[in-house]
């Protein structure tokens, strides 16, 4: 009988450790804590060598964007979150690029350089802060699973807001690219002229494994814990 209790105790400890590790993996991969407002004199550019070459350009694009006239917009997601965006009008009735940023990014940081490109092409731009990022509500990032439903909601909003004849291009980078690609198998309205997807990932599993490697853990070992954490929490 004592052996049985020992075995049960060991199993319970192992189960608790698995749940704890899964929770920590969930926090690192999916959880997005409440975000303080960025000070008006600060530009949110990540640290790291990958950004140094482009830091000055990114800061200039962000400052130029802040100086541009815009209209703040918001929608309510399917699960009750307030999602926010900013609309930059090139001209009345111009085609609109509906733009989505990357993993743990912000519309200002990832997309500000794209607004000038839109204007050069005669397009307006609606920059979206994805759920769990910047000014939008939410504490969970789902690598496009929920975000692509938000994309469809923004698309419906744009058609209602700008008229049934508005022309729309869905644009995204990184996780935002995968977000817009995930809607490509839906019955999209004829308003959608096309999709611009820059460096999207091939699947949620692949990008999660990449995130695990960036955290310094073996992807094949960490992925089951991340997957379990997503299901539990």
Kindly label every feature range from the protein language model.
Residues 94-102:
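Short beta-strand element of the alpha/beta-hydrolase
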Residues 12-75:
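An N-terminal hydrophobic leader/cap segment in hydrolases
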Residues 78-89:
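A short loop-to-beta-strand scaffold at the N-terminal edge of the catalytic core in hydrolase folds
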Residues 103-117, 130:
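The serine-hydrolase catalytic nucleophile loop
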Residues 141-162:
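Alpha/beta-hydrolase active-site loop
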Residues 118-137:
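Conserved alpha/beta-hydrolase
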Residues 162-174:
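Alpha/beta-hydrolase fold nucleophile elbow
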Residues 182-233:
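Hydrolase active-site cap/lid region
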């Amino acid at each position: 009988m004592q052996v049985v209790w020992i075995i049960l105790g060991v199993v319970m400890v192992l189960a608790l450790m698995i749940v704890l590790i899964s929770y920590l993996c969930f926090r690192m991969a999916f959880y997005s804590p409440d975000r303080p407002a960025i000070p008006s004199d600060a530009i949110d550019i990540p640290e790291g060598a990958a950004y140094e070459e482009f830091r000055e350009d990114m800061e200039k694009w962000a400052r130029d964007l802040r100086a541009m006239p815009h209209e703040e917009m918001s929608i309510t997601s399917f699960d009750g979150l307030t999602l926010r965006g900013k609309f930059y009008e090139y001209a009345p009735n111009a085609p609109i690029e509906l733009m989505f940023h990357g993993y743990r990014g912000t519309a200002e940081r990832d997309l500000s350089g794209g607004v000038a490109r839109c204007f050069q092409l005669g397009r307006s731009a609606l920059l979206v802060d994805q759920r769990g990022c910047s000014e939008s509500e939410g504490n969970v990032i789902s690598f496009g699973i929920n975000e692509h439903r938000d994309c469809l909601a923004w698309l419906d909003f744009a058609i209602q807001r700008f008229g049934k004849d508005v022309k729309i291009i869905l644009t995204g980078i990184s996780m935002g690219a995968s977000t817009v690609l995930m809607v490509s198998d839906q019955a999209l309205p004829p308003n959608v002229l096309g999709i611009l997807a820059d460096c999207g990932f091939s699947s949620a599993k692949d990008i999660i494994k990449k995130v695990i490697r960036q955290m310094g853990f073996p992807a094949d070992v960490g992925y089951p814990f991340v997957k379990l954490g997503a299901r539990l929490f």
